[in-house]
Design a protein with these regions (language model features):
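General beta-strand structural signal in soluble alpha/beta enzymes
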Residues: 26, 51-53, 90-91, 108-110
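Gly/Ser/Thr-enriched, mixed-charge loops and adjacent short helices
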Residues: 1-83
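Short acidic/polar active-site loop segments enriched in Thr and Asp
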Residues: 47, 86, 128
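Solvent-exposed, flexible loop/coil residues
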Residues: 56, 64, 102-104, 112
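Glycine-rich phosphate-binding loop
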Residues: 80-102, 107
Length: 129
């Protein structure tokens, strides 16, 4: 197995900006990602971004920042539906876990979106499936 080590930030941004205009709801959960989310969303030129709970506050006044708990995703689900977003993304407190909501407000679990991501990566590098 070949291990690929590469900084992908610029390549990732190129992929993101090549996609059709997309509307994204982000629930930062008052966690650490609040410190960098503006930089990330400012680089997504083809997106409309709706940020909720973006102010860093370790007391987590809106909900516990654990996107694996459905109750913690209720604000994001409402934002996706109310704003007719294409996708909703939520982070945990330190930004190392991701919660995903589809355009209908359904939770997309990690094993489901990892399968999609792995398929896309395999296609990028022409990896045999």
């Amino acid at each position: 197995m070949k291990i690929l080590k590469k900084i992908i930030t610029k390549d990732y941004y190129k992929i993101l900006i090549s996609i059709k205009k997309i509307k994204i709801a982000w629930d930062i959960g008052n966690g650490a990602m609040g410190a960098v989310i503006k930089e990330i969303t400012n680089n997504l030129n083809n997106s409309e971004n709706i940020l909720i709970n973006e102010e860093v506050d370790g007391n987590f006044p809106n909900h516990h920042p654990d996107p694996t708990v459905p109750k913690n995703m209720e604000q994001l689900i409402k934002s996706v539906k109310d704003n007719k977003c294409d996708i909703g993304l939520a982070f945990d407190g330190d930004g190392d876990r991701l919660g995903v909501v589809d355009n209908l407000g359904n939770l997309v679990w990690a094993d489901q979106y990892m399968l999609l991501l792995c398929t896309e990566i395999a296609n990028l590098y022409d990896i045999q499936k």
